[in-house]
């Protein structure tokens, strides 16, 4: 596993040097900046740089990065949200971490304390670390990104249907979606309070739908120092533009953690 993690870190560093040379030059030469973008439900033939006109999808910005940098033709990836993120962040096969199926609110499996974490490795090497978007590695306080090496997290914890309740109009008239994704109660997380009307209390931070976007911070990437605040519900309407909010949060983090100002590289 350690060899795999080391190889993973090397690949990320190589990828950053190839694709983000300008940004990397701002950080100390031996520690390049790392900006990794993960997309859900995207296959190789959804990206123009790979399908080369055989499919209808157009991805000009991604294609430009590929044309100016490097493309990888051989790779390993898990084919679900939770399993893919587990493999990426830990370097472990998801089965070993007990994180194979997509996580639902209140799930008893989650990313356990002490699990190897790429973010923690990089934080220990002097990186400023942040994650933005969907996490999907469990909703326990111990599973949040800011308990596993990230100093900041802004985003949401499940797939969109679980965030909003059931999104189909003919079903959405139900007051809750308990039969699909049971509401549950907070575990003690500084800044978040148990919502009214929850049922089946569990050791988790999920809410009755629509569930909230949260903003968490931890100066040293540990659960002990993490605190979170509610950034408002991720409704069906908000989900149409939440990517713009995520982009704004990433840009703000990069501005605040500019290596020219902090003398530290970043991992986002």
What are these regions (language model features)?
Residues 1-4:
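Positively charged n-region of N-terminal signal peptides that target proteins for export
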Residues 6-19:
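Bacterial N-terminal signal peptides
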Residues 23-268:
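Formylglycine-dependent sulfatase
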């Amino acid at each position: 596993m350690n060899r795999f993690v080391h190889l993973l870190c090397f690949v990320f560093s190589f990828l950053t040097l190839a694709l983000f040379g300008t940004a990397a030059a701002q950080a100390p030469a031996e520690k390049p900046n790392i900006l990794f973008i993960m997309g859900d439900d995207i296959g190789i033939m959804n990206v123009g740089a790979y399908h080369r006109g055989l499919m209808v999808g157009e991805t000009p910005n991604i294609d430009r990065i590929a044309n100016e940098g490097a493309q990888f033709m051989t790779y390993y990836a898990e084919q679900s949200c939770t399993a893919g993120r587990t493999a990426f962040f830990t370097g472990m096969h998801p089965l070993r971490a007990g994180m194979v199926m997509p996580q639902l609110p209140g799930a008893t499996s989650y990313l356990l304390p002490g699990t190897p974490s790429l973010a923690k490795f990089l934080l220990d090497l002097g990186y400023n670390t942040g994650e933005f978007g969907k996490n999907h590695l469990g909703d326990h306080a111990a599973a949040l990104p800011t308990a596993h090496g990230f100093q900041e997290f802004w985003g949401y914890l499940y797939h969109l249907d679980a965030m909003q309740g059931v999104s189909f109009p003919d079903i959405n008239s139900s007051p809750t979606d308990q039969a699909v994704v049971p509401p549950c109660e907070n575990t003690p997380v500084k800044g978040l309070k148990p919502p009214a009307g929850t049922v089946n209390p569990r050791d988790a931070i999920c809410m009755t739908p629509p569930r909230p976007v949260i903003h968490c911070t931890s100066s040293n990437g540990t659960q002990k120092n993490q605190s979170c605040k509610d950034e408002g519900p991720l409704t069906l309407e908000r989900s149409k533009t939440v990517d713009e909010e995520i982009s704004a949060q990433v840009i703000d983090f990069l501005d605040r953690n500019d290596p020219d100002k902090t003398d530290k590289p970043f991992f986002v």
